[in-house]
Curated annotation (Swiss-Prot):
Cofactor details (free text): Binds 2 magnesium or manganese ions per subunit.
Ranges for domain ATP-grasp: 104-287
Identification of the protein by name: Probable alpha-L-glutamate ligase
Keyword set, alphabetical order: ATP-binding, Ligase, Magnesium, Manganese, Metal-binding, Nucleotide-binding, Protein biosynthesis
Disulfide bond residue pairs: none
Native source organism of the sequence: Pseudomonas putida (strain ATCC 47054 / DSM 6125 / CFBP 8728 / NCIMB 11950 / KT2440)
Top-level taxon of origin: Bacteria
Pfam family, one: RimK
Cofactor(s) needed for function: Mg(2+); Mn(2+)
Protein's gene: rimK
Residue sites binding ATP per the record: K141, E178, Y179, D187, R211, S212, N213
EC code: 6.3.2.-
Positions with a binding annotation for Mg(2+) 1: D248, E260
Xref: PANTHER family: RIBOSOMAL PROTEIN BS6--L-GLUTAMATE LIGASE, RIBOSOMAL PROTEIN S6 MODIFICATION PROTEIN
Length: 301
């Protein structure tokens, strides 16, 4: 197969591994800088140009679209879909998963366990918002943040009020969530491919920190997940419409709670921790399911 990898940086671990795994399995892998591709939208024959030439003959596309380029990245991916190229994850699903609020609303509607969550812009009754999520300690998140940036743990109602007021002053939409103390600063990243969790790891925040992101100095280790956690991760990915996803779960006293569903999960942490060839399994999934004109939405979304 001829497979495009949409990525800003061919040197990133995840991009390198996908190219390696695809090449080893006999595919032609082409890395395309998402922002440098440009499109002919209104022709009877949809096209994407790159470095002065049309991109042609692709069977599948692997989107590795960073959060900051979601809008343009999804537009390029949608154009590939219009051209009948099979996407590993569809543009509609990626856009959906990048909207944290919409994601939680969809997961909640399907009865998937979530932390109690409030959403606000400039609430006229801050104490009531704080009470809504069972009071302090609580976590406040900026809607657009990634890698643990824009996430604050407030230990007291006073601290929570100050932080909410500060974000209001910045005209930010915020999420206010109950703090799951029993998780002990750890979460579980379940790596879903198709309808299986193919690998999972525990991420433990460094001492004195509550954010377990590896970018924040969190430490990854092997973990055996429960059947309930496995089912939750697979269902969460399915609700979002993602074939490949990193589902972040907290262990709480009332079962697994989904924190986030990531449409472009990094491979380095999970491969190094588990020793599994995750990139190879992703390519294998493409071989089984990919092929021209196999996209469900046909670029409609």
């Amino acid at each position: 197969m001829k497979i495009a990898v949409l990525s800003r940086n061919p040197r990133l671990y995840s991009t390198r591994r996908l190219v390696e795994a695809g090449t080893q399995r006999g595919h032609e892998m082409v890395v395309i800088d998402t922002l440098r591709a440009y499109m002919n939208i209104a022709s009877h024959k949809p096209q994407i140009h790159y470095r002065g030439k049309p991109l042609e003959g692709f069977d599948a596309v692997i989107p590795r679209i960073g959060a900051s380029v979601t809008f343009y990245g999804c537009a390029v991916l949608r154009q590939f879909e219009m051209m009948g190229v099979y996407p590993l994850n569809e543009s509609v699903a990626i856009a959906r998963s990048r909207d944290k609020l919409r994601s939680l609303q969809l997961l909640s509607r399907r009865g998937i366990g979530l932390p109690i969550t409030g959403f606000a812009h400039s609430p006229d009754d801050i104490p009531d918002l704080i009470q809504m999520v069972n009071g302090a300690p609580l976590v406040i998140k900026v809607l657009e943040g990634t890698q643990g940036i824009g996430v604050v743990l407030c230990e007291t109602p006073q601290a929570a009020e100050s932080v909410i007021e500060a974000f209001m002053g910045l005209k930010q939409n915020i999420m206010v969530q109950e703090y799951i103390k029993e998780a002990g600063g750890a979460d579980i990243r379940c790596f879903v491919v198709g309808d299986k969790v193919i690998a999972s790891m525990k991420r433990q925040a460094k001492p004195g920190e509550f954010r377990s992101n590896l970018h924040r100095g969190g430490v990854a280790s092997l973990i055996k997940i429960t059947p309930e956690e496995r089912i939750t991760a697979i269902r969460a990915a399915k609700v979002m419409g993602l074939s490949v996803a990193g589902v972040d779960i907290l262990r709480s006293n009332h079962g697994p709670l989904v924190m986030e569903v990531n449409s472009s999960p990094g491979l380095e942490g999970i491969e190094v921790t588990t020793g599994k060839n995750v990139a190879g399994m992703i390519i294998e999934h493409l071989e089984k399911n990919g092929g021209p004109n196999q996209t469900r939405t046909k670029g409609k979304g």
